[in-house]
Amino acid sequence: MFFVVTMTHPDGAGWGQHVMAHVQYLNTLVEQGKLRASGPANGLPLRAGLLIFSVADRAELDALIAADPFATEGLISELTVIEWNPLFGTFAAEATPIAPPRSA
């Protein structure tokens, strides 16, 4: 299953103190094939990141997010999670097939 996650972080010393541990954690998830893409969101008033996960289910995703150093240090001020079915593009071969619409 694919999930698109956004994380918003408060500005402050905590972000700078824990950003390298966060990046190392994300790199580990990339190596494991669980995090497929990630990066900062540009042009927003607060620091934010977008992450695309490919995991077995929502429970696995929740556990991965909970283990992120930004989460353990209380540095996620807003989190959104959307289950995503990438029918077109780079991840399409891994999408869940859906039946085509019936014609009238």
Locate predicted features.
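Conserved, structured core segments of small domains
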Residues: 1-104
